[in-house]
């Protein structure tokens, strides 16, 4: 049981003790004379003392002192943030327009890179200029839609096209030697039914079908079809991948039941092809961390501390046990390897040490494995003993040099990498919606297909199609040929280091294939993973640069800005996908408390329209409407809770919406369909839905899941006043099929 203690006079929370806590490990809080949070402190079961101290000036947070580092926030007129410092070093400074609108005019990084912004008379962004002279310009047509966007750095111009309902129906990129266009087709319920991508004259079509609950029932991409079966809780129980009528891969899933209640935790994952059958079995601890994975031959077990950080990996297949230790700020301090054992450790076979010697920024790595690490002012790594790095536009990795070979990166206006070259070898990349769609390496073209959840499904290479086999964490563990035989097999450690690459095509397809651990893009020559916003070094288990939120101070409220996945690489990934939960949280952090509305085309509305819980309500209310014999319309209202399922969208809704209020206005529509004398009257039911709530954090949550941790961080922030509650509503329509 979790115990809470409140001050008898002021009713403020003084301490929290979780079931595994003692009086020495509980979390304690103190407050200033205005009852704002002054300190928060706790000690983990491994002895790490975690703490944070808050300082205010005129109701604005001006200093945050963590266990290792002090962050300072300065403000100018109208309480607009003017700078962020770590210790005595400036990370970012801000200037604003002199007019009453006070738009952000320039962001200057501590390394003197900058971005300058320009606006039109309507306050719309019209241009960005960078320190190297490169520019991105924006223009708008008479309807307010974005006109073609030229990018001087990449030489690519992007044009967007919309239909009469303001839905994006096509975007096109053009440049020297580059032509990429994507067109979208929607049904009457605004569900995407097909997507046609044309790359340098070659077209690929992806089509979608949906079941009665508006869940994707099949997806066909580049001629590969994957179909889905769901259980009563909306969980995927089977995926079948086919090439035409031939089944290549069948995957089935079972789920854990805890205390008689269903969960989204996968218990078994069986992957079957004609040449390969593997059954993975998973076990979990009370916090939902994966504690063991077995493939029927070998088992890997994992141990975590009370902060859910990975502290030990026992890898039976590799014959290695690894232990990991961290300081009180979540920085890894030692990575030690031993001969495989699940019991008492023997003599260490390898040790990688970490040193954090920057007195201003104690989270910044200064030495690793005996090598000196250098970084620039804002935390971008410059050298690590094996590689050297240069940067542009603040946080874009411009070059990587390893073994005397320099790789130069090129990015588009959105900061997405489009090319890397060493002068002899060149990789070109084309992305569609955050997914790598095509890669060309020295004239060899690879096209990629994905399933409904964004997991890699297939790749064309050398005139043949190959199929990805992945585990539930998204790692590409094998590549299969058309007969289902594995031609490439990969193994990884917990942090994504590639341990082995085997198979008949290991030296060709296995080397060229960029999609590896977690489906991330792997740069074979440098050993880095490209995660779009940052680069990740699996040898160190850290990012090369600080979280992008450092430039606004937002990331300070969360976890270590260099740590990868909360130091829990087994159970988490760092997708670059768009998170509604993140946007809504940032609105609470940086907003003024004003109401927010999300329309039919918003990411929130799109995910709500696929929510099993909301669609079930719609079905029930349609039945009530029919039974009522209403002539015009009926209005229904109440509350519903989003289901925290297994997909990224499910978890996003659970974090952002949780439980909310809804109003549903249902009407009946009729039409006559047919041809010549063969006509039929059809009917459907349409609902205009308003989902609304107050976005706030009014209570502490038990447990140490990611959602609970984020809620409790925000709970403290709301008490302090730097998180502002606001009302929000999403307005959208859903409809039944015509019958």
Task: Name what the model sees in each region.
Residues 20, 175, 180, 199, ...:
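Short, flexible loop/turn elements at secondary-structure junctions
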Residues 1-86, 90-109, 113-130, 134-220, ...:
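Beta-strand elements of repeat-based all-beta scaffolds
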Residues 4, 98, 257-258, 352-358, ...:
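A motif-centric feature for acidic-aromatic and gly/ser/thr-rich catalytic loops and repeats
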Residues 553-556:
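Short linker/helix segments within small regulatory modules
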Residues 591-595, 599-739:
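Catalytic toxin/effector domains delivered as secreted proteins or via bacterial secretion systems
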Residues 417, 497-501, 537-544, 559-583:
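Short, low-complexity export/processing leader segments characterized by acidic and small residues
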Residues 377, 393, 472, 537-539:
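A cytosolic small-molecule/anion-sensing beta-strand core signal
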């Amino acid at each position: 049981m979790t115990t809470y203690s409140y001050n008898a006079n002021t009713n403020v929370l003084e301490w929290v003790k979780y079931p595994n806590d003692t009086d020495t490990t509980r979390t304690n809080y103190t407050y200033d004379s205005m009852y704002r949070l002054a300190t928060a402190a706790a000690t983990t079961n491994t002895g790490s003392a975690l703490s944070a101290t808050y300082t205010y000036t005129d109701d604005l947070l001006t200093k945050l002192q963590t266990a290792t580092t002090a962050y300072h926030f300065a403000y100018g007129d109208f309480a607009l943030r003017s700078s962020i410092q770590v210790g005595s070093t400036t990370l970012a400074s801000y200037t604003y327009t002199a007019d009453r609108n006070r738009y952000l005019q320039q962001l200057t990084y501590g390394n003197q890179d900058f971005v300058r912004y320009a606006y039109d008379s309507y306050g719309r962004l019209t241009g960005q200029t960078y320190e190297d002279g490169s520019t991105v310009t924006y223009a708008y047509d008479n309807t307010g839609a974005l006109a073609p966007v030229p990018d001087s750095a990449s030489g690519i111009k992007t044009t967007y096209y919309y239909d009469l309902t303001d839905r994006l129906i096509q975007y096109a990129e053009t440049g020297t030697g580059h032509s990429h266009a994507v067109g979208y087709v929607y049904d009457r319920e605004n569900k995407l039914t097909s997507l046609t991508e044309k790359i340098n004259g070659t077209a690929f079509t992806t089509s979608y079908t949906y079941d009665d609950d508006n869940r994707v029932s099949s997806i066909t991409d580049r001629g590969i079809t994957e179909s889905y079966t769901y259980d009563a809780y909306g969980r995927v129980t089977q995926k079948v991948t086919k090439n035409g009528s031939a089944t290549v891969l069948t995957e089935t899933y079972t789920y854990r039941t805890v205390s008689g209640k269903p969960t989204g935790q996968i218990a078994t994952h069986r992957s079957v092809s004609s040449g390969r059958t593997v059954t993975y079995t998973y076990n979990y601890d009370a916090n939902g961390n994966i504690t063991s994975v077995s493939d029927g031959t070998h088992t890997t077990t994992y141990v975590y501390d009370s902060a859910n950080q990975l502290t030990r990996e026992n890898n039976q297949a590799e014959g290695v046990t690894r232990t990991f230790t961290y300081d009180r700020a979540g920085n890894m301090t030692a990575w030690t390897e031993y001969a495989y054992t699940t019991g008492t450790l023997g003599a260490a076979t390898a040790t990688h040490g970490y040193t954090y010697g920057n007195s201003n920024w104690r989270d910044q790595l200064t030495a690793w494995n005996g090598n000196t690490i250098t970084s620039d002012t804002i935390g971008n790594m410059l050298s690590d003993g094996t590689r050297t790095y240069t940067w542009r536009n603040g946080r874009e990795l411009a070059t990587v040099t390893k073994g005397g070979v320099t790789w130069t990166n090129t990015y588009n206006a959105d900061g997405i990498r489009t090319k890397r070259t060493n002068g002899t070898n060149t990789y070109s990349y084309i992305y569609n919606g955050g997914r790598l769609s095509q890669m060309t390496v020295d004239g060899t073209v690879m096209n990629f297909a994905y399933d409904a959840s964004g997991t890699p499904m297939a790749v064309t290479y050398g005139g043949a199609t190959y199929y990805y086999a992945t585990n539930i964490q998204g790692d590409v563990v094998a590549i299969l040929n058309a007969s289902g035989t594995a031609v490439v097999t990969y193994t990884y450690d917990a942090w994504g280091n590639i341990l082995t690459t085997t198979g008949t095509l290991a030296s060709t397809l296995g080397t060229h294939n960029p999609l590896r651990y977690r489906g991330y893009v792997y740069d074979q020559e440098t050993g880095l993973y490209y995660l779009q916003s940052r680069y990740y070094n699996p040898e160190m288990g850290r990012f090369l640069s600080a979280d992008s939120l450092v430039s606004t101070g937002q990331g300070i409220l969360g976890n270590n800005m260099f740590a990868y996945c909360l130091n829990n690489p087994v159970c988490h990934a760092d997708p670059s996908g768009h998170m509604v939960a993140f946007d809504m949280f940032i609105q609470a952090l940086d907003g003024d408390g004003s109401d927010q509305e999300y329309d039919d085309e918003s990411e929130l509305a799109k995910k709500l329209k696929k929510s099993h819980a909301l669609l079930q309500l719609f079905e029930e209310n349609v039945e009530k409407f029919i039974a009522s014999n209403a002539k015009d319309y009926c209005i229904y209202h109440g509350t519903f809770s989003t289901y925290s399922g297994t997909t990224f969208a499910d978890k996003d809704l659970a974090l952002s919406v949780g439980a909310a209020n809804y109003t549903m206005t249902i009407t009946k529509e009729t039409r006559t369909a047919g041809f010549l004398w063969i006509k039929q009257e059809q009917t459907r039911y349409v609902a205009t839905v308003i989902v609304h709530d107050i976005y706030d954090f009014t209570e502490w949550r038990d447990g140490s899941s990611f959602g609970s941790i984020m809620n409790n961080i925000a709970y403290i922030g709301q008490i302090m006043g730097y998180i502002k509650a606001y009302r929000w509503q999403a307005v959208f329509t859903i409809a039944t099929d015509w019958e």
